[in-house]
Amino acid sequence: RDLAMTVQYFLEHPDYTADFFEKKIQSVWAEPTFQSLWIQEVKGPGWLFPSFTRSLFREGGWANEIYWELCNALQSLIYGGALLFVIFKRGRVRFEGLIFAVIFIGGFLFHLFWEAKGQYTVCYFLMLLPYAWSGFGGWIAWVNEQLGDRAKGRKA
């Protein structure tokens, strides 16, 4: 009954629905640490931890900031590489080469409509690693091809 009421509310309020799903996707798929520090939140005597650990767990701590930036760069590289895969390898991959993509898309859709936390979705994110690697390989091959064509044009 609650589900039916929620669906009805979403249907009657499309702006709210779009905002809800936008925020949900951002909090789950664009948070670069996948809540790895949030789930480590310390309840109790945090002063017992070494200063590095406190700095890592505390939002705004120097170690926390470094960790977040490194995770953000890595996440951006993986998403970017997966996009390059779509651009450069489109139509040249056998079906069995897409199994991780199917799992990722299935996980994305499942958590779009079900409970979601970054810590639940990191396993799907990791499915993008082979595509990111291949995507960067496709991009490098394309760049080399472009440079080779320019070099040939200068020699002629």
What positions do the PLM features span?
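Membrane-proximal low-complexity regions enriched in glycine and acidic/polar residues
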Residues: R1-K23
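Membrane-interface anchor segments at the N-terminal boundary of transmembrane helices
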Residues: D19-F100
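Transmembrane-helix signature of polytopic, lipid-linked glycan biosynthesis machinery
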Residues: F85-K89, I103-G118
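Membrane-interface junctions at the ends of membrane-embedded or membrane-associated helices
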Residues: I87-F95, A132-A156
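Active/binding-pocket-proximal capping segment
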Residues: V102-F104, L126-M127
